[in-house]
């Protein structure tokens, strides 16, 4: 609970749109993207000037404690997207379509994607998969829903892939990735995530497609980069992937703050006089007067 009010937000920078992202590729300007799953983190990432905020299904692991992304539900994704929406004013807000939200039927896939736009305020959705997602992408575009593709290491397919493994190492695998990328590009995705693939393959795809490529573990030749916010903050409980760069130790800061708070309370150092509220003098005087009167009345009855 906080009794302080928020500072008003002022940002004169223009709103990031699909056109903004595509224009950056044309001008060869790097595109930035980070995940965020709640109001506070989304607001901070937005105010830092990041181009895109992704409410990723990775929240299953970093926010909800699941072992992988598969268990997270539509309702959980909608809940977190709504929270992020309240924090994002400038960046492009993208919501991840969770596992089984677009696999069962075309009708259900469209309904779920539309819920992200209509109910949660997302401006685009991300869908994992290559050639086999072309019809879905086109169907969503027909409903005016922008789509970000995602190929390479697709976490929703970990059981099929045999775990979190780098993809595209053989000639056949490279050719399959190229087909996936070209198919999604032709279908009309406004951008595509390339995850866990060799740098050389990512560079080939980036040169081949018109849609901006956003790398995560795909080397520096993509049009942009995305990372999980909790990874760069060291706010996870698993060893980082090779491609993760740690920019802060938030886990260490939280642990220290919690220990210091505990020690201060147990040692009688918190709260201090300066951290306590006080009665106005006139109210204090009135209470003291009442107390005196009660004592006088009590003595009179003895």
Language-model region placement:
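Alpha/beta enzyme core
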Residues: 2-248, 252-299
